[in-house]
């Protein structure tokens, strides 16, 4: 007999009192039987189950052999008894990380409680959340034959009957959004036809959906998992569809100011994306917000920097109504001279979002000439409605970023004869988005790379030409791009009527330099997390802090600032508080791996107006998608994170039970003994590729067939997966993954013959005219009534063919040809056609049981089952004193044997506890 193993605790570990007498690991039939037996003896039992319900695999079955009694009718009373037993505590949706035994004989159990995102104390199990959930995932209860919802109750007879939200992490599209917009959520809602709900979800995070649907650079699409396959989901186009549809139906917002208004006042300096976002979120919290804008109109960069052919100004106007509807007061032509003035006016906090509205100069001769301007100066005039006649003129734009592309394309629409973008590096190094560059070239903009202005040439104070130098690329600079080096003697002159300098923008923060700390580049010094400045009541964000950035980033900064301004005004600490902690991003490789049968759905190309039509007006270049196109595009979403955070369940729940802020919890318990009842694993038919499982839809395994036959089955009858046809010629292939050295599993699984006979008889009950054939090597009928059960099957007309199946091939009509060795017919190779084949897969050891105890202390037998020290004289006793094993964790067993073995394990545990009490 092997010696028992003990893990020694460090001497400074204090003595502990056990919380429970017994820990039972696993809530299947073995775990429940052991727990109930010990609970009835008066012992305190902790039952830990990793799923959201107890019941194990028995609850999945249709009926039990050989009596053909209802599996649910037997198991559900036991589940209820376990759940309500006064001496049993069930800890569901939890996993054990490690179990260690100390010198005091007690076991320390480290637990990981997985978040359900539902308060089970409040949940009534009504199922309303499942009805409205927009994400479909494979249904494990029905062997993945059909879908269930991400928010779901495990199965109809679940104990407890409580909802769980499947969140694998945050979807890459949502995780990468700087504003925290739940892209996965609104895409899923559009897919479900819930367009208004999609709009409202967006408004929870960002109040400028119309502007974002046109001018956002869509980092979400860049991270879309589908983009690694045949093309990204058109997230921005889907957003535009839902926004345009909503705005057409709602010219003004449906809501007004909040009912509860706080006494504190907040000033926002600047009405660009950051300022508007902060004002919106602060107003929703009940603050009285005033926005000060120096320009004649509201919108900042949205209005003055982005041309109408990309972002129509009526869309900006409608977006701004989302903010003013909350009671936000926006004062245009109201520049703020000092922050002290705002304090004197009674404002309790200030959000400084002055933006970057000033361009840099090149510092070359002639820059003061009439006809030399910066990109913001040019765009302000053009977008502000000032008449600019560029007909017949040559315009040059210096720079390689997006701020260079917009003036160039705008100049063409204003009638310029020739437009040149001059950039000192190569096109490869241009920071502008490639699609923007392509659009400019398509419209006729010339690209002059590896050139830079040396001086501007004028006549009578007006620009006439530019003298440029040719450049070559040298060694990389601090940015990682190769440094441009002038080529001596390469000067060349180009006639130019208008020069637009798009070489960068600087923040409009100079008026506040004496009051708050600024960086050398003029940006505001603000805490990266809280955005609080050197003046405690002043917060700052957007381009004023980051320098020139993207709209969505500025919106995110405004949202962040509102969170911390709210805490500041409530007198709460800003230290140690994190703003929006999403779940970790989902690994794209894992997403692709879990969708092996993905149907390729090519992405629809972006549609634009013809070039001639574009240049004739300021009409939007990009054309909208139709409702059908939007939903089709949304249907390509892979639901990377599981739950999409659409919050439909939150709105539908009458008990208010959903809490998406839940996170994984760690816990420790101390117990006196352990029963391992982790059950078994089923053989994966894919490991026998010649049998076609996973390749041919009409090759299924026995668990899938059990679900098709169960009273709670996914369909009204037995249907084959490929076409929904009722099969009339069904085959069973026994010993799939059992007694097979090619898959390293030499053992007989004991139950496959009988469960196949059970299913065959049930099939004849459901499909009386069906032909059922069982391919077998031999039939194991060792239990009480098993031989009679076999004879009963033969008497019902089920065919038995003694022979080993070698291969299964699919016919064009979905039928399957089975190639087998006909042992009783002379041993020759035969072929038989069936329209559905069931693989009677074997039972495998659950190796997770061995990993519960660090260091390999829990020994296994030669087949990786938990080893019993002496299965005849000491059934259930393992290599660790005080640890016992029950059911199929130690060997393949049928249900009656599992119940008996669990009783033995419980008896052994009780005897061990008595010995501990006596100190022997």
Identify what each model region corresponds to:
Residues 19-21, 93, 120, 262-265, ...:
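Phosphate-coordination loops involved in phosphoryl transfer and adenosine-cofactor binding
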Residues 407, 544-569, 743-755, 886-916:
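A conserved FAD-binding loop/helix module that cradles the flavin
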Residues 77-119, 312-361, 373-391, 413-521, ...:
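A Rossmann-like FAD-binding core segment of flavoenzymes
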Residues 8-9, 139-161, 368-393, 476-548, ...:
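FAD-site-proximal beta/loop scaffold in flavoenzymes
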Residues 20-84, 149-153, 172, 178-192, ...:
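Beta1-alpha1 glycine-rich phosphate/pyrophosphate-binding loop at the start
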Residues 2-13, 51-77, 91-122, 134-172, ...:
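Non-heme iron-sulfur electron-transfer modules
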Residues 123-129, 133, 173, 177-178, ...:
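Short cysteine clusters
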Residues 391-425, 483-498, 522, 530-531, ...:
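Long hydrophobic segments that form regular secondary structure
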């Amino acid at each position: 007999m092997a010696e028992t193993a003990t893990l020694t605790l460090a001497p400074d570990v204090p003595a502990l009192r056990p919380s429970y007498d017994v820990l039972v690991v696993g809530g299947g039939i073995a775990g429940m039987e052991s727990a109930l037996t010990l609970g009835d003896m008066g012992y305190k039992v902790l039952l830990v189950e990793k799923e959201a319900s107890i019941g194990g695999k028995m609850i999945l079955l249709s009926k039990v052999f050989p009596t053909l009694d209802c599996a649910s009718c037997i198991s559900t009373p036991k589940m209820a008894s376990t759940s309500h037993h006064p001496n049993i505590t069930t800890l569901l949706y939890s996993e054990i990380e490690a179990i260690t035994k100390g010198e005091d004989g007690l076991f320390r159990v480290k637990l990981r409680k997985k978040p359900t995102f539902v308060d089970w104390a409040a949940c009534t199990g009504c199922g309303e959340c499942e009805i409205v959930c927009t994400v479909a995932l494979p249904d494990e209860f029905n062997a993945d034959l059909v879908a269930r919802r991400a928010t779901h109750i495990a199965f109809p007879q679940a104990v407890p009957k409580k909802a769980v939200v499947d969140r694998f992490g945050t979807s890459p599209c949502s995780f990468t959004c700087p504003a925290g917009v739940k892209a996965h959520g609104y895409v899923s809602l559009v897919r479900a036809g819930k367009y208004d709900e999609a709009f409202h979800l967006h408004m929870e995070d960002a109040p400028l959906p119309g502007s974002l649907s046109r001018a956002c650079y869509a980092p979400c699409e860049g991270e879309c998992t589908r983009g690694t396959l045949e093309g990204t989901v058109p997230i921005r186009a889907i957003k535009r569809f839902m926004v345009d549809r909503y705005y057409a139906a709602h010219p003004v917002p449906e809501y007004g100011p909040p009912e509860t208004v706080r006494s504190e006042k907040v000033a926002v300096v600047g009405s660009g994306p950051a300022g508007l976002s902060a004002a919106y979120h602060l107003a929703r919290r009940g603050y009285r917000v005033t926005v000060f804008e120096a320009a004649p109109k509201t919108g900042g960069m949205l209005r003055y920097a982005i041309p109408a052919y990309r972002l129509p100004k009526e869309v900006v106007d409608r977006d701004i109504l989302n903010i003013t509807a909350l009671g936000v007061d926006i004062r245009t032509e109201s520049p703020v001279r000092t922050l002290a003035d705002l304090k004197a006016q009674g404002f309790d906090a200030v959000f400084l979002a002055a933006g970057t509205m000033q361009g840099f100069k090149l510092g070359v001769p002639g820059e003061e000439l009439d006809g030399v301007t910066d990109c913001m100066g040019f765009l302000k005039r053009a977008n502000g409605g000032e008449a600019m006649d560029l007909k017949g003129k040559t315009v040059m734009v210096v720079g390689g970023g997006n701020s260079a592309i917009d003036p160039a394309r705008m100049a063409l629409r204003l009638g310029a004869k020739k437009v040149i973008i001059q950039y000192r590096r190569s096109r490869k190094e241009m920071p502008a988005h490639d699609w923007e560059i392509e659009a400019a070239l398509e419209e006729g903009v010339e690209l002059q790379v590896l050139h830079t202005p040396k001086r501007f040439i004028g006549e009578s104070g007006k620009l006439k030409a530019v003298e440029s130098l040719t450049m070559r690329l040298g060694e990389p600079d601090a940015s990682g791009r190769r440094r441009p080096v002038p080529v001596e003697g390469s000067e060349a002159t180009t006639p130019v009527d208008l020069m637009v300098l798009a070489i960068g923008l600087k923040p409009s923060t100079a008026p506040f330099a004496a009051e708050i700390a600024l960086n050398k580049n003029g940006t505001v010094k603000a805490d990266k997390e809280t955005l609080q400045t050197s003046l405690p009541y002043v917060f700052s964000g957007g381009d004023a802090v980051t320098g020139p950035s993207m709209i969505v980033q500025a919106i995110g900064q405004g949202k962040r600032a509102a969170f911390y301004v709210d805490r500041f005004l409530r007198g709460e600490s800003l230290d140690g508080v994190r703003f929006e902690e999403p779940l970790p991003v989902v690994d794209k490789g894992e997403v692709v791996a879990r969708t092996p049968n993905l149907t390729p759905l090519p992405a629809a190309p972006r549609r634009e107006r013809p070039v001639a039509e574009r240049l004739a007006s300021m009409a939007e270049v990009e054309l909208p998608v139709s409702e059908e196109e939007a939903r089709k595009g949304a249907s390509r979403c892979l639901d990377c994170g599981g739950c999409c955070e659409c919050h439909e369940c939150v709105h539908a729940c009458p008990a208010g039970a959903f809490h998406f802020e839940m996170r994984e919890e760690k816990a420790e318990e101390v117990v006196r003994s352990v029963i391992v009842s982790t059950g078994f694993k089923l053989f994966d038919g894919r490991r026998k590729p010649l049998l076609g499982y996973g390749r041919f839809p009409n090759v299924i395994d026995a668990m899938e067939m059990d679900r098709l036959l169960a009273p709670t089955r996914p369909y009204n009858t037995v249907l084959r997966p490929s076409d929904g046809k009722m099969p009339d010629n069904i085959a069973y292939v026994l010993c799939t993954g059992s007694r097979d050295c090619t898959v390293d599993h030499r053992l007989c699984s004991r139950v496959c013959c009988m469960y196949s006979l059970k299913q065959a008889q049930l099939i004849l009950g459901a499909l009386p005219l069906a032909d059922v054939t069982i391919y077998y090597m031999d039939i194991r009928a060792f239990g009480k009534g098993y031989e009679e059960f076999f004879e009963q099957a033969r008497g019902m007309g089920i065919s038995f063919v003694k022979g080993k199946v070698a291969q299964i091939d699919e016919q064009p009509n979905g039928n399957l040809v089975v190639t087998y060795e006909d042992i009783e017919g002379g041993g020759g190779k035969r072929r038989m056609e069936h329209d559905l084949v069931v693989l009677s897969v074997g039972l495998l050891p659950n190796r997770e049981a061995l990993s519960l105890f660090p260091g390999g202390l829990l020994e296994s037998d030669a087949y990786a089952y938990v080893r019993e020290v002496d299965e005849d004289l000491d059934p259930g006793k393992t290599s660790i004193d005080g640890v016992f094993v029950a059911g199929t964790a130690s060997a393949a067993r049928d249900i009656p044997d599992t119940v008996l073995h669990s009783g033995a394990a419980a008896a052994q545990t009780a005897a061990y506890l008595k010995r501990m009490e006596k100190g022997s």
